[in-house]
UniProtKB/Swiss-Prot annotation:
Lineage: Bacteria, Pseudomonadati, Pseudomonadota, Alphaproteobacteria, Rickettsiales
Organism, scientific name: Wolbachia sp. subsp. Drosophila simulans (strain wRi)
Gene field: rpsK
Keyword Ribonucleoprotein: yes
Protein name: Small ribosomal subunit protein uS11
Function recorded in the entry: Located on the platform of the 30S subunit, it bridges several disparate RNA helices of the 16S rRNA. Forms part of the Shine-Dalgarno cleft in the 70S ribosome.
SUPFAM superfamilies in the cross-refs: Translational machinery components
InterPro entries for the chain: Ribosomal_uS11 (IPR001971), Ribosomal_uS11_bac-type (IPR019981), Ribosomal_uS11_sf (IPR036967)
GO annotation, cellular component aspect: ribonucleoprotein complex; ribosome
Pfam family, one: Ribosomal_S11
Family membership noted in the UniProt record: Belongs to the universal ribosomal protein uS11 family.
Length: 128
C-alpha cells in the first residue's frame, strides 16, 4: 500500500496588521493580529524570560515587542502595522520604538486606555 504524502499548509501573508500592546504595572503583553482582529502571534515579557521586578521595565517591554515583530515578519511577511496601546504601564514607548527598529512601518498609534468616569469603588488605602 502506497503512503500518501501530504503537502504542508499554504503560507498566508498578511502585509498589514495591528499590534495590541497591553502594559500593566507588572507585565507587558504584545499581541499581533490581522486587520479583522484574528490573533497571528503573541508574546509577553514573562514569556521572553524576564521575571520579578524586571518584568515591569521599559527594556523588557521593548524585547517582548521585538520578539513579536520578528515572529510576525518571519511567519507572515508583515510590513505595515498600526499600534493600539492599552494600560498604564511603563513600556509602551519602548515597545513602539522596538517595533520600528525591527523594520515594521508604524502608520498610527492609538491610546485606548480605559478611563473610569467614577465607576467602581477603589480598594482601601494601604497603611504602611
Amino acid at each position: 500500500m502506497k503512503k500518501v504524502k501530504t503537502v504542508g499548509k499554504s503560507k498566508k501573508e498578511f502585509i498589514t496588521g495591528v499590534v495590541h500592546i497591553r502594559a500593566t504595572f507588572n507585565n507587558t503583553f504584545v499581541n499581533v493580529t490581522d486587520v479583522h482582529g484574528n490573533t497571528l502571534c503573541q508574546t509577553s515579557v514573562g514569556a521572553c524570560g524576564f521575571s520579578g521586578s524586571r518584568k515591569s521595565t521599559p527594556y523588557a517591554a521593548g524585547k517582548a515587542a521585538e520578539a513579536a515583530a520578528k515572529n510576525a515578519i518571519e511567519r507572515f511577511g508583515m510590513k505595515v502595522v498600526s499600534v493600539i496601546i492599552r494600560g498604564p504601564g511603563f513600556g509602551t514607548e519602548a515597545a513602539v520604538k522596538a517595533l520600528q527598529s525591527c523594520g515594521l512601518t508604524v502608520t498610527s498609534i492609538a491610546d485606548k486606555t480605559a478611563i473610569p468616569h467614577n465607576g467602581c469603588r477603589l480598594r482601601k488605602k494601604r497603611r504602611v
